[in-house]
Amino acid sequence: MISFVGMQTQEVTIKPHVKVILKSDSELLEEVVVTGYGTFKKASFTGAASTVNTSTLEDVPVLSVADKLSGNVAGVTFGSSSSNPGSVSSIRVRGMGSINAGNNPLYVIDGTPVTSGDLSEFTYSDAGTDILSSLNTNDIESITVIKDAAAASLYGSRAANGVVVITTKSGKQGKTNVSFRSDWGFSNMAIDYRPMLDGDSRRELLWTGLKNYGLYTGNMSDADAATFADQNIEDFASKPSTGWTDWKDLLFRNGSHQNYQLSVSGGNDRTKFYTSAAYTNQEGIIYKQGLERFTGNANLTHKFGDFEVQVTSQFSKVRQNKTNEATSYDGPVANYAFFQSPSSTPYNEDGTLNNGCGVFGVNPLYEREHSSDVYTLMKAFNTIKLTYNIWDKLNLSEKIAYDYAQGTNDVLWDRHSNNGAPGGVMQRIVNRNDQLNTQTQLSYINSFGLHNIDALLGFETQDTEYAFNYMAGQDYPGDLYELTNAGSTSAETNRQSYRMTSFLGRANYNYADRYYLGLSYRTDGSSRLARENRWGSFWSVSGAWRFIDESFLNPVKNVLTDGKLRMSYGVNGTQPSDYYAYMNLYKYGIIYNGQSGMSIVGIANPDLKWEKNKTWNIGLDLSFIDRISVTFDYYQRKTSDLIYDLPVSQVGGYYDGNYGYTTPQNIGSLKNSGFELTITSTNFRNKDFTWTTSLNMAHNSNKLTKLDGQQNEIVSGPLIHRVGEPYYSYYVYEYAGVDAETGKEMFYLNDGTENARKTTTNISEANKTIVGKHQASIEGGLTNNLKWKFIDLGFTFTYSLGGDAFDYSTWQHSNGGSYLYGGAVPTYYDISKMWTGPGDTNATLPKFEYGSAASLSSRWLMPTDYLRLKNLTLGVSIPQNYISKLGLSKARIYFSGSNLLTWKSKDLFVDPEMRVDGLCTFETPALRTYTFGIELNF
């Protein structure tokens, strides 16, 4: 008898030479779904969840959790405002479910909810610091994304936006295994990000603008207008003696990264262990941008008698160097890189940096030498769990988890910088997040003939404390920048905490592994709400029918090898993001008219209550000839009692400008609906060659269904939040092309009459209208994995169709002409496409004229359709007969590349995987990375 894990046992006759080919056992290899409150076979799971393929986690070297998920899970979308190493990414599961209370999913590590999001909220960089960047992705065993209420409702108020369940590696019974992994690589921009005209092309364009100014504003003759342009062009586009300056080349560089990890695992029938240590160093594509990380992880499980104890400990230290990027803060380097004129010279004749050059009067090379933004994070996540096996069907467990994170952010503008003059400014922000979780669970699993029951009761507490200290010093007498050396200092402290107490239960029943029923209930009490509204109840009911086992399908079972219909309905909730929104808040330390006092910084709303998410899902799982599997889900998600920060009058007594003049109200409703499709196939499989393919696609429709009942829209710049429309809709004048006689921009009237599609060059006659939305119509990914003998190849494409973005920054270049004439010019301003004179009917861009202001219109609306080679990995495993003599069980070398190719609209000058509202500013673009590595197992 010959057997192997995951293979069917076979009996063979004993002979001198025997050749045996074991067949896979689909039941043993069946995919499981880890929910945090239990592990289920996918065949018996009644909800909607996706699990990332184990080989994807193991073989593809990436540095973030988001990169592990990208392109592999239907219905999960990603956005980022920066590719600064360690920066925050936004992850959305089935759209957005809130306005002000947060849209990020709940992250659960080894069964415990953890702190997530941006920890460095008081810095001057758009990048932020993702607390999950402290997690070593090589320690991850599996990732499951829970999308509907069937399992998510057990997490109650924290899971309205989905749950990402991360299971870290643990020891396995068998000999001790030592694994070493190391990789190195480099990175650059994934696309030609915001290309600019070179010096000569820019000079030609500006000369044309000056001439047109003379012709159409100065009423000059053609010859006089040309002379006028010749006389003034040197003021705007003079060529330096050292040649044109390429600011993009000066401010950006190739990034690099290196990663080293050593892990040891093993165990016996009583004790299992896994431990690892890792070091990561990543340099960004902007000088002084990078991340350095040390991590340690230990997981120990020990059985004694009727007890089992499990201890996990994760520690990390992260040092993140950031650079200011967009337009909202002082010294934004990425902003400068695309605004500086090629006529500006960064260096003086003696080789020193030339301070004061450029459109903003700031030399970005000078600023970066005299400023810094460094964030240091210390994080520890420790758990201990004791399980008592009361009898073989009944278990009682108690778990305590402590999640600790402390960060220190040092921001410096020294005495020589423009922002720090004359004496320098240093700011230090120290923030701390503590979270203590306790979980008590009683679980019961039993079978009675064809009846199978899996039930759980639980009690949980969560205590969270957040504190920060802000200290600032200025007027330094020298170049030693510590707070104690400052001529003057200021400080501010804050501490806040909240508690949540929860009772929960679930029961799953199935008959003959054919008919399934699931029930769950949870009630949460949160100190973020007034006593009258403190408790919220969340529940779900789900069912499934595994119809493949019905006799009437016997004739087609040779083709249809599995089939299951699923349905679920449930209610989740979201609590306010503010800890004390229901209370009146005051702040001391305010100076008014030379007297100390206090100010109002929060207006109470004791009626504030939970947001409610009501979700239903219907799904179908099919398998054909044991090679092709299809999963289809349709869902509808309605959010009511939306928490919205309603503006209030400042006359009421608000004094401190650091706090918004708003009060939270439950005033709105949102609706998300859509479908998800995943098709997985084993295209070919024999003893030497295997080829599998997975395709996923998703559509989500998001609409705002209610505001406060009195107004039906809120306008914010080019965005509008209007009832009946997607939340991120663009509301501007509709561009109608170029007037052939005057060369001016034309706009559609959109006045609601029969003249709506008539055009005008007078923008005051036109009306704004919704011209697009950021939400894509279809998004998804395509993954192929091939293995031939000792060579493996995997690649993933991601794609998106039907969305729009608003290129705010290209419009800024044209605003009043001042940026164009003082700084850089985007290649968008193609002189060959511009109006040349009366009767020009071929122009797609209006007349270019000095001082002319371009209007905020759909001219700046760009399609976000794209297809991207998200990842490609090629590995070679050295055959066992070569490495066994060296004491190795595995030796693999590999190459991996991410964002290698991107196909997108030529009109989109930024990366298509952008921030969630689609407003394009100046961020560090997505990176194309090349990684070379080696993996050794002993």
Model-derived regions, located:
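Transmembrane beta-strand segments that form the barrel wall of outer-membrane beta-barrel proteins
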Residues: 182, 277-283, 517-526, 683
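Surface-exposed loop/interface segments of Gram-negative outer-membrane beta-barrel transport/assembly proteins
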Residues: 103-104, 109, 173-244, 284-291, ...
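Residues on the lipid-exposed face of transmembrane beta-strands in outer-membrane beta-barrel proteins
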Residues: 168, 180, 262-266, 296-302, ...
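Active-site phosphate-binding and catalytic loops of NTP-dependent enzymes
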Residues: 77-81, 153, 548-556, 882-884
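Repeated loop/turn-to-beta-strand initiation elements of outer-membrane beta-barrel proteins
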Residues: 270-273, 306-309, 393-396, 450-453, ...
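Short, small/polar-rich motifs associated with maturation and membrane association
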Residues: 1-297, 303, 308-310, 314, ...
